[in-house]
């Protein structure tokens, strides 16, 4: 089941055991970016009315 290369996701990225860690970091960063985008997008009309 496990090859001599060690634990990997099998995505062909050559990251080995760091693959899941890197994907997790990228996923969290993407979620934070999307949250900030939607939060700022929804806040724009209120900011425009205040001017």
Curated annotation (Swiss-Prot):
Q: Where is this region: LG region?
A: 9-16
Cellular component GO terms, alphabetical: magnetosome membrane
Which residue spans belong to the Cytoplasmic compartment? 34-51
Keyword Membrane belongs to the record = yes
Post-translational events: Seen in gels as a band of about 5 kDa, with an N-terminus that corresponds to residue 8, suggesting it may undergo N-terminal cleavage.
Q: How does it sit in the membrane?
A: Single-pass membrane protein
Where found, per UniProt?
A: Magnetosome membrane
Which residue ranges does UniProt annotate as crossing the membrane?
13-33
Q: Which UniProt keywords apply?
A: Biomineralization, Magnetosome, Membrane, Transmembrane, Transmembrane helix
Q: Which domain of life is it from?
A: Bacteria
The record makes one more remark, namely:
This bacteria makes up to 20 cubo-octahedral magnetosomes of about 45 nm in diameter which contain membrane-bound crystals of magnetite (Fe(3)O(4)).
Q: What does this gene product do?
A: Might be involved in magnetite crystal growth.
Q: What is this protein called?
A: Magnetosome protein Mms5
What organism is recorded for this protein? Paramagnetospirillum magneticum (strain ATCC 700264 / AMB-1) (Magnetospirillum magneticum)
**Top-down, what is the taxonomic lineage of the species of origin?**
Bacteria, Pseudomonadati, Pseudomonadota, Alphaproteobacteria, Rhodospirillales
Tell me what gene encodes this.
mms5
């Amino acid at each position: 089941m496990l090859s001599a290369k060690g634990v990997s996701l099998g995505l062909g990225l050559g990251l080995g055991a760091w693959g899941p860690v890197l994907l997790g970091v990228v996923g969290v960063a993407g979620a934070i970016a999307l949250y900030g985008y939607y939060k700022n997008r929804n806040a724009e009309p209120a900011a425009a009315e205040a001017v």
